[in-house]
Amino acid sequence: MISSLRGMNDILSEDYERFTHFITVATKIAQRYGFHFIETPLLEETALFKRSVGESSDIVGKEMYQFVDKGENDVCLRPEGTAGVVRAFVQKKLDRAGGIHRFFYHGAMFRYERPQKGRLRQFHQFGVESFGESSVYEDASMIMMASDILKELGIGYRLQLNSLGCNECMPPYREKLINFVTKHKDEICEDCTRRVETNPIRVLDCKNEKCQSIYTEAPKLLNCLCSTCESDFTTLKMILKQNEIDFEIDTNLVRGLDYYSKTAFEFVSDNIGSQSAIAGGGRYDRLVEFLDGRPTPAVGFAMGIERLMELIIMPEAKKDGYYLGAMDDEALDMIVKIAQKKRKSDIVILEYKTKNLKNHLKAADKSNAKYCAVIGSNEIKDGTIWVKNLEDKTEKTILSELF
């Protein structure tokens, strides 16, 4: 038997209902905030992610599905969504058009990770990206949108905030952090030893418990912010408080991608094990320029759909549509034509096996149809259809031409 690849799951039945429910809710709320849908290719040039996500990141260094295609192009399956949206933004010259551009997307991403609960090799993200607005009020709007989505889905969360500073306040902080980590060079893991050389701030994202305990004493970036970054972060906290969105400060929150600056945030859940992050994002004002566009302020977030599917509280399923069945072969020939007509306005589940009425009712109930409609010899003779409402249990016989 051929099975799906490890870490790449099928989505069907109840999972599909949860998946589509999430997409419906998230799309509705993103559109309320004035965002428009964008779709980018699954396959991109590898250079896109090396320049955006960062060559020092785990994603680029360890996790990408990368290969050389038949045209000798170095390509990879997208590991995240933001870089592709920024590439499209620059390629379509929207960075030169001025104004504010807001997009949302959803689709499959790919990372060669060790599969575990809440972490797959093919997974789906919903994300939003805003270009052209530098105000911290836009950062707050991103957080409020994510909060609205989670609340409508019935998902509880804790919101964690940090500021990663800017080009002015990051260099002196980086020097302080390097000095601190160097003092502990014999205690930290191999990944952190490598990160100190490539991107020191990423050591704070280490999941090694020993490293985490060491970094609790590390210098705090919030204590090194320039006046502008400090003012923006204070304003962000004020906006969230005014809108009754609770948050906690996490000074070690740096996100897993190299392009973030200033605002960084994560929504976490205590109900899905070690992979607790269910949404996250922040500001990335330099990324458009990194990808050869004009300097453009930008902010966004992404949500891991599979992780959220474990937490979604689904609305009670309602019976809907018609189950249509025949009691003999002559009736079976008739119901196909009747079903085709009815499908122009309603859901119709057609049963191709002839059964007695009792068995048709059982099958209709299992199908979650609201109505069971059956034709037998008497109905053929009278030109009628017998219909039962499976919710209120009422029955009626109507002319087939009126069905």
Curated annotation (Swiss-Prot):
Cysteine disulfide partners in this protein: none
GO biological process: histidyl-tRNA aminoacylation
Predominant localisation class: cytoplasm
Family: Belongs to the class-II aminoacyl-tRNA synthetase family.
Catalyzed reactions per annotation: tRNA(His) + L-histidine + ATP = L-histidyl-tRNA(His) + AMP + diphosphate + H(+)
Gene designation: hisS
Subunit and interaction comment: Homodimer.
InterPro entries named among the record's database cross-references: aa-tRNA-synth_II, aa-tRNA-synth_II/BPL/LPL, Anticodon-bd, Anticodon-bd_dom_sf, His-tRNA-ligase, HisRS-like_core, HisRS/HisZ
CDD domains listed in its UniProt record: HisRS-like_core
Protein's name according to its UniProt entry: Histidine--tRNA ligase
Subcellular location: Cytoplasm
